[in-house]
A protein has these predicted regions:
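Juxtamembrane boundary at the C-terminal end of a transmembrane helix
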Residues: 677-704
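Hydrophobic alpha-helical transmembrane segments and adjacent short intramembrane/lumenal linkers
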Residues: 564-568, 577-679, 684
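TPR/TPR-like (Sel1-like) alpha-helical repeat modules
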Residues: 426-448, 475-477
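Selected alpha-helical membrane-embedding segments in polytopic membrane proteins
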Residues: 495-595
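Boundary/linker segments of alpha-helical solenoid repeat arrays
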Residues: 414-416, 442-457
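Eukaryotic scaffold repeat domains enriched in small/polar residues
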Residues: 28-425, 559
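Selective detector of the "anchor" transmembrane alpha-helix that sits immediately C-terminal
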Residues: 459-483
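Hydrophobic core
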Residues: 15-23
Length: 704
């Protein structure tokens, strides 16, 4: 495959583009559209991207040669037509999906007696394969079913047998119909799930009920209720699951839902794809605009209001955000592909978008306030992307590679392209190249699978060398252990040989913590230089871990490294513990000096230091399924060091075990207090500096 050699070049282009384009999303080509075009990289940062969709035309009543729309609240595509629910006009306008020309206006709906039926204010529409119309008549609290000639076939009212609470209205807002003509209705006042009806209008069951999300407020209220009387609990608001705000159905009969959480920060499971059993089978990702602050590990999410969701023939998701007037596109792997649209009323933007449908490769958005349907068509770049998706299921790997390479030539920031190219390499058995592509895409799970195959092939090719290396390593460990054991053993009639040299003393405490720290105090083995050396090893280990932990377990970048935080994790923590313990134990008649406390605690950190280096090295040879080994190494290092700290405090201060535990608990409390005081002092110092700076600046300005 000749073109496979281009991947290294494309990777270099991508890395260069990240350096040049990791800027505010306002850095766009102003000729592309009236809104910002961007996508997110593997680190959650917005980067410039060519426009995937641009506004093509607006469908209005005037353009179709009919009276103007009045609040088009919903649209649906069926049978080669697009049906627009013109809510306040009480009519349905059908246009041809091929050229968006007028097909027919349905404005006279009658019952069996010939009386006209009015459904003005309706919020939802569905059309079956046999041409029947299903109307969510919201104001009249009913579902109307008409045949293709607009004659009433069925009226569905509130199912009293399951909704026996007379206070709960049947305010049906959205509706979909599957291939068996089963009806799924959404009511904003009913949080038990989607109501499923048979083709004859009989209530069947609730479908896809949401659960109450466990939050700190839920836990707090639950604990508080235990102390309240029955009457008091009855007066308190009950936690109820969040309802849906919209739903749609794809060609395979899967129902997509949108949670009713207007203008709330995005979260996982806001968009769901419900299986036939009502379970969410969609990958849980965070939808919407976001920028990630890696230094504080806090995900800043812009406020948004999702109102509709649609899919195309390739499994891509299109999500409409009425709060920001944007459409977000995600591929079937959950990767953010593009965003387009906006709020301001210009071409390609909206004032009150209400519904979304995908017609072939076009995206149609109804704007209730502007009384129009805005059509977006893919650009040249967008056509390349959709064309690449169209061949994704092909067995022709060369064709798939070429398609996604063409996408990268137009946009080297497209992580979906790297993901798909990685998939091609993986299917070819080129696991090293697949790992490189998955790494750029930030696809850790796929990287792990490719690495597992690569590791297996490597071991098969180099088994003899690996076995020889393991034998040599075991021999080196054995002789090293024998040497250390000899140096740390007790010889008859002599002292501990290791204690004759304080530089090797910490090794003895690893195996003999109590005896070791007893000798530490009696023989004055403390050394500031050695203690600082161990802490320095911890500091270097943290840096080593940050940069060299395997990609499967770590996607840190060099620019995310925070030196002050790293210093606080190593030097700062141990110094703070030593100061707090010395302060507490001075009041509790402890025998240890500050030097003894500081050095003994530093010595006790040696197992954890070893675990940091071992964990980092091992992370480059393990897969995601083997992460338990890293957890075990980390836990052993922490517990071993914690045990040594207890032994150190026990021996240095000459405490009983109970006194030692109490002293450590008080030390932790003192650390919290000291930390609070440091933060308070820093805050006050900052405010004083700001005040002094403003005063001096004012004086300088007045003196001119």
């Amino acid at each position: 495959m000749s073109k496979l050699k281009n991947f290294t070049k494309l990777s270099a282009i991508f890395l260069a583009a990240v350096c040049l384009l990791s800027v505010n999303v306002s850095a766009k080509n102003p000729t592309d559209s009236a809104y910002k075009n961007y996508q997110y990289n593997a680190y959650g940062e917005s980067l410039y991207a060519p426009a995937t969709f641009l506004p093509s035309e607006k469908i209005t009543g005037k353009k179709l040669g009919i009276s103007e729309f009045n609040a088009p609240t919903d649209t649906v595509s069926a049978n080669g037509k697009i049906y627009i629910l013109d809510s306040n006009n009480g009519r349905i306008v059908a246009i041809n999906s091929s050229d968006y020309s007028l097909f027919k206006v349905y404005d006279v709906f009658v019952d069996s007696e010939g009386s006209q039926i009015d459904f003005k204010g309706a919020q939802g529409i569905a059309v079956s394969k046999d041409g029947n119309f299903y109307i969510a008549d919201t104001n009249n609290k009913r579902i109307l079913v008409f045949d293709s000639e607009c004659r009433l076939k069925l009226t569905i009212l509130k199912p009293e047998e399951v909704l026996n609470d007379s206070k709960v209205p049947f305010d049906v807002k959205k509706i979909v119909v599957n291939s068996d003509n089963q009806i799924f209705a959404l009511c904003s006042s009913i949080n038990s799930g989607i109501l499923a009806f048979s083709a004859e209008g009989k209530f069947l069951y609730f479908f896809g009920k949401n659960t109450v999300e466990v939050t700190s407020d839920i836990i707090k209220n639950s604990m508080l209720n235990k102390f309240l009387s029955k009457e008091q609990r009855a007066l308190r608001a009950k936690a109820t699951p969040v309802n849906y705000s919209n739903l749609s159905i794809d060609d395979d009969g899967f129902i997509y839902t949108v949670k009713a959480e207007a203008f709330q920060k995005t979260e996982k499971s806001v968009i769901q794809c419900l299986s036939y059993t009502g379970e969410n089978i969609l990958k849980e990702i965070e939808f919407g605009d976001y920028e990630v602050d890696y230094l504080t590990n806090y995900h800043e999410r812009t406020e948004t209001s999702f109102v509709d969701v649609g899919t195309d023939a390739y499994g891509n998701l299109y999500i409409l955000d009425s709060g920001r007037g944007r459409i977000y596109q995600y591929d079937k792997n959950g990767l953010f592909t593009s965003a387009f649209g906006g709020i301001d009323g210009y071409d390609g933007t909206f004032t009150n978008p209400t519904s979304l449908i995908v017609n072939n490769e076009d995206v149609l958005i109804s704007d209730e306030r502007e009384n129009c349907i805005q059509i977006f068509k893919p650009t040249v770049y967008g056509q390349k992307v959709l064309g690449a998706y169209s061949v994704n299921d092909s067995n022709e790997l060369e064709k798939r590679y070429d398609a996604w390479s063409d996408v990268l030539e137009l946009n080297s920031n497209n992580i979906s392209a790297y993901y798909e190219i990685g998939t091609v390499y993986d299917e070819m058995g080129e696991y090293k190249q697949a790992m490189d592509a998955f790494k750029i895409a930030g696809a850790q799970n796929e990287y792990s699978k490719a690495f597992q195959s690569y590791r297996k092939n490597f071991m098969n090719r180099n088994m003899l060398v690996i076995i020889a290396g393991i034998v040599l390593l075991c021999a080196a460990i054995y002789f090293s252990a024998s040497f250390v054991k000899k140096k740390t053993s007790v010889k008859t009639g002599t002292a501990f040989s290791v204690l004759e040299n304080k530089w090797t003393f910490p090794l003895y405490t690893l195996k003999h913590p109590v005896d070791g720290f007893e000798q530490f105090k009696t023989r004055n083995c403390e050394s500031y230089l050695l203690a600082i050396g161990i802490i320095l090893l911890l500091f270097i280990g943290d840096i080593f871990s940050f940069f060299k932990t395997g990609f499967i377990f770590n996607i840190n970048r060099a620019i995310d490294f925070n030196l002050p935080v790293t210093i606080m994790k190593s030097f700062g923590f141990i110094v703070l513990f030593a100061v707090a313990n010395w302060s507490v134990c001075t009041l509790l008649n402890g025998k240890g000096t500050f030097k003894e406390i500081f050095t003994s605690v530093a010595y006790a950190m040696l197992p954890y230091v070893f675990s940091v280096y071992l964990r980092t090295i091992m992370s480059n040879f393990l897969t995601a399924n083997e992460s338990i080994f890293l957890t075990v190494i980390n836990v052993i290092g922490i517990l071993w060091s914690a045990m040594l700290v207890i032994a150190a405090i026990y021996s240095v201060h000459q405490y009983s075990f109970g006194q030692t535990v109490g002293a450590i608990l008080l030390t932790l409390l003192a650390m919290a207090i000291i930390g609070f005081l440091i933060i308070l002092f820093y805050t006050l110092l900052t405010q004083v500096y700001s005040f002094a700076y403003s005063v001096i600046s004012e004086l300088v300005l007045k003196s001119r």
